[in-house]
Amino acid sequence: FQAEDEIAAICSAIGASYAGSLGVTSSSGPGIALKGEAMGLAIMTELPLVIVNSQRGGPSTGLPTKTEQSDLYQAVYGRNGDAPMPVISARSPGDAFECAIEAVRIAVQYMTPVILLTDGYIANAAEPWAVPDLTTYEAFPVEFLTEVPEGGFKPYGRDENLKRPWVKPGTPGLLHR
């Protein structure tokens, strides 16, 4: 999906997560700054989301073809209202594959947005690496609440991982009134 701007892109990804699919969006520093308020929305609504930041050089539009690793503070602290978010950083193109899997695992296991940092070099580079056997990875199944639990539905109830239930809109018996 090609959105008209950065804000629409992240809001569409949040909508995908709200509907029961994992939303993913990407940009670089200036675009990540524009996505900041919506990141806070995803944190507040406890929706899984992966945000990829391919860092580039300079402030503002800067040097779009120059790589730089200067967005760490933006990734860690770049939201208002004490809105913490896990941040993962890839060290190579092959590592980006592993980091993406970890970002998805954290996002769905803890119902939170995750930032995946990369840079222009990693985003444009290639390296030989064997695609791993995915059956060797530990599964992290996504579980949706499909029926009203005993004692009623508590949207902000927590499990042993402090995760709230993920409910698809329109699930019978789990509708907001």
Where are these regions (language model features)?
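Flexible, low-complexity linker and terminal segments
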Residues: 99-177
